[in-house]
């Protein structure tokens, strides 16, 4: 059986930040980080077009969680996954956040979920460390 090494892969997830009293500045900073990403036309694996940018003026006063979602489809991104993760981690280093989740769905090796967690209560740009763990689920079919 010949394998298709250029099978479609889908990457999606979200970055969450719980805003506090200085939340508006954090939201502006996060927005600048997302807008500073390269365009999809640059062939960057992580690019600004894959993100849904939350509007700064539209927020529910009942909640304080900023959710920045993203998604894209690729041909065989799992073969360049090291580089995708490096680019995503570089973005996270520039942002305020409390957690991030990335799902990688591949036709060949199932679903991988990457969970990014701060080492404290909040990741501060260029100052805080974070950890990542991977969970793998493969369809038995």
Regions found by a protein language model. Give the residues of each.
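Short, extreme N-terminal segment that most often corresponds to the first beta-strand
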Residues: 1-34
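Charged interaction segments
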Residues: 28-141
């Amino acid at each position: 059986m010949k394998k298709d090494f250029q099978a479609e892969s889908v990457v999606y997830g979200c970055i969450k930040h719980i805003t506090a009293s200085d939340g508006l500045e954090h939201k502006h900073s996060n927005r600048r980080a997302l807008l500073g990403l390269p365009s999809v036309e640059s062939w960057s694996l992580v690019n600004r077009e894959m993100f849904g940018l939350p509007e700064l003026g539209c927020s529910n006063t009942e909640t304080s969680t900023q959710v920045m979602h993203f998604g894209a489809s690729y041909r065989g991104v799992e073969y360049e996954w090291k580089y995708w993760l490096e680019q995503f981690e570089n973005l996270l280093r520039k942002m305020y956040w409390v957690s991030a989740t990335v799902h990688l769905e591949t036709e060949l090796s199932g679903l991988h979920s990457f969970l990014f967690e701060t080492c404290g209560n909040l990741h501060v740009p260029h100052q805080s460390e974070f950890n990542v763990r991977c969970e793998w689920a493969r369809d038995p079919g």
